[in-house]
Amino acid sequence: MKDVIALAKAKESAMIRDLQGWIRCGSVYDETTVSTEKPFGEGVSNALEWMAQTAERDGFMVDRCDGYCTEITYGTSPEIVMVLGHADVVPLGAGWTKEPFGGVVEDRILYGRGASDDKGPTLAAYYALKILKERNYPLKRTIRIVVGGNEESGSRCLHHYFQELQRPHPIYGFTPDAEFPLIYGEKGIMNYRFQGEIHDDVLHYLHSGVAANSVPDSAIAHLVGHTFSAHQFESFLRQAGTTGSLEINKDQAILTVHGKAAHGSTPEHGLNALSLLLKFLAEHTTSSLAKHFASKFLAYDGSGLDIQFSGERMGALTMNLGLGSYENGHYSFILNIRYPIDCDPHILSQTLGQHALHKGELMSDSAPLYLDPESPFIQTLLRIYQELSGDKKTQPMTIGGGTYARNTVNTIAYGMGFPNGGHGSGNIHSPDESLAIDDLVLGTAIYLRALFELANM
């Protein structure tokens, strides 16, 4: 197979049009529109249907999988090479300067929620398969693309696909939902909640966060009977390197603290507005809730909760306080924890429970993933990336992020994020999420060769 970059480049305009159309299907999970036919709500259902109709347009076999996934198949061999992408996106959050569901292109960069996570990369893999089909390249194995609808909030889509529908697992697979060159290991992912009923003399209302796996970029609290001054609040914000607002009306106050959004697997890249707000309340008010939890949530290494841990193969545990609320006497804080393969999740959960004020609850736990980085499968994908990108410096890695790879076998994360943001892609889970057109083309070329070689190994 020669000149795959030219083959991908020839599809550039069509890919841009299709990606814009897909992004316009705003596909945040919406519980209010969930039904039997639309298990993740109307927006996600529309995005899955868009992909189904696009594949039918191009002559592929399509299965809608009870509304949980869109399955696209090329070939009839029982041995399957699989691509796992997703159509759902995280909530928007604040701070966008582009239309979030517009897909606008400026200076060869396409903006929109889902541009790089994960509609753009999934579409790149789809166009790679489309090129293979159109040019009738010989393939020994079936290639199947499965587009899920619930990656960002539990992966119930793939549970339904593999467990309920009993669809076959792949011989080889990859998900275009992380970084190049490739990810051969993923930390375990635990969601843990502290909750209970409490009467707080000062705190009347608290809200922050859009998802457990995102660093909150804003937090708001309503107080009654506060004793701090505006100067103290302003000084706190300056020292924290952030901004906020304060409204005072007699003995009542509304505080807002701004932070910086980031993916929950890399809390060090963000600034957690919720943990900062709790810190201020603990230091400058008599809030019993803040005083109990503030110091526990500050450090993203988990040291405040005695769960700090570092492993030889995957590095250190990280913790993100993703969601927090207090209303009508009920509080809830949800932690998103990424732990290495050497860390015992049972001990981790038990240790967290010891810090509960009322109730600690293990919400979910997904075990770590680890494949041999020296295997022929992984070395093949690495070689293809290096040959087409020219990048022989960046090494395969393990990550704290969780992808679809852990839901099946013989599957890793393979792109589509390029080192150092490629040509301008990024802001995953943040405002102005983007995908550079040049990265879209190169990613498509890499996936084209990868699918061809994996299907013929």
Which residues fall in each region the model found?
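A common structural junction motif
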Residues: 88, 237-245, 284-285, 354-359, ...
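An extended, acidic, His-containing surface patch that forms the Zn2+-binding/catalytic region
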Residues: 53, 265-328, 334, 338-347, ...
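Midchain, well-structured core segments that form catalytic/ion-binding scaffolds
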Residues: 159-340
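Acidic/His- and Gly-rich active-site-bordering loop/insert found
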Residues: 1-113, 137-139
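Active-site metal-coordination/substrate-binding segment of hydrolases
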Residues: 80-147, 153-154, 166-168, 426-439
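Buried hydrophobic packing segments
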Residues: 122-132, 161, 223, 277-281, ...
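Acidic, glycine-rich active-site loops and adjacent beta-strand->loop/helix elements
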Residues: 87-89, 143-154, 176-181, 210, ...
